Design a protein with these regions (language model features):
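Alpha-helical transmembrane segments of integral membrane proteins
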Residues: 1-9, 32-36
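Helix-termination/interfacial motifs at the ends of transmembrane alpha-helices
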Residues: 5-8, 12-25, 143-146, 150-229
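Large intracellular
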Residues: 20-161, 233-286
């Protein structure tokens, strides 16, 4: 929603201001300039990225126009799920978790948290390390090291679309200049035309520079920032799972382990101690 608001504010400010000072909006409509700038940007994007990055970027872009799914309620659900699983392991033994982690979609515990179950990255990360915990062949230090490596790998993969968008955005002003120079060349080749026509041709050429800068800093740059923020939010989910499981492996009770997880969350989404305590009580009562 905020993306649409930001886009509307940008367009109204730029084009509205131009119209208020007496400019003719029709002069800014230059399909050929748009074709040159957009085509060069798309070509550079394809040239500078592999198939994997191109696919992931195309998949990420539509999600940017939706609100973030990682909010306070989701984090509360995550800590509630972790508490239930760790409490079951502590009370009935870690081997009792096998049926839940082998097929989470059929697990009566996981099925109570459909939002989390829909995120296969989160479910896979959680079940993989619970499986290692059940196996009992690795200590907490080894599991922590492995978790750090996987989180770093995920972060690098997740950042690829944001970096790809950022590089294209950074290049758009230059492509705008290219389009403008091409327009100036065309104008100079038509030096025998009347001044009125030459003035119109120069104005058309300058639109290229304007569009390149506007597209870069008004649209593509902000989208790359949103993509980067979404990666950071998902990474925070992994970190919450990590510290909670490690706290359990180090002997802390489930209620204390989820408190470890709470402390790593961003302050804007982090529940208070009493909120988490009350949530754990409700989970216990189920």
């Amino acid at each position: 929603m905020l993306i649409f608001v930001g886009t509307l504010v940008t367009l109204l400010s730029v084009f509205g201001g131009y119209a208020l000072e007496g400019g003719h909006l029709g002069a800014l409509v230059q399909p050929v300039e748009i074709l040159m700038i957009a085509g060069a940007g798309i070509g550079a994007f394809i040239l500078g990225n592999g198939v994997k990055t191109i696919k992931s970027t195309l998949l990420v872009i539509p999600t940017l126009f939706k609100g973030s799914k990682y909010n306070k309620d989701v984090y509360m659900e995550l800590m509630g799920l972790l508490y239930v699983l760790l409490a079951k392991a502590r009370k009935e033994g870690t081997l009792t978790l096998e049926s839940d982690i082998e097929d989470p979609h059929k697990s009566p515990i996981f099925s109570q948290y459909p939002k989390l179950l829909a995120d296969h990255h989160i479910v896979e990360f959680m079940t993989d390390y619970l499986r290692l915990m059940v196996g009992g062949n690795m200590n907490a230090f080894e599991i922590e090291s492995l978790m750090d490596e996987e989180i770093e790998t995920h972060h690098v993969e997740g950042e690829a679309p944001a970096l790809a968008l950022q590089k294209v955005g950074d290049a758009m002003p230059a492509f705008g200049i290219v389009a403008a120079v091409m327009g100036v060349v065309h104008t100079m080749a038509s030096a025998d035309q009347p001044p009125a026509i030459l003035g119109e041709m120069i104005a058309q050429a300058l639109v290229g520079t304007f569009l390149g800068i506007l597209i870069s800093y008004g649209f593509i740059g902000p989208l790359s920032s949103v993509a980067e923020q979404r990666v950071a939010e998902q990474t925070k989910m992994f970190q919450c799972i990590k510290v909670t499981i490690l706290a359990s492996l180090n002997g802390y009770a489930p209620a204390i382990a989820v408190e470890f997880g709470r402390k790593v969350l961003f302050s804007t989404e982090r529940p208070s101690f009493s909120e988490l305590e009350e949530h754990v009580r409700r989970v216990k009562a189920k």
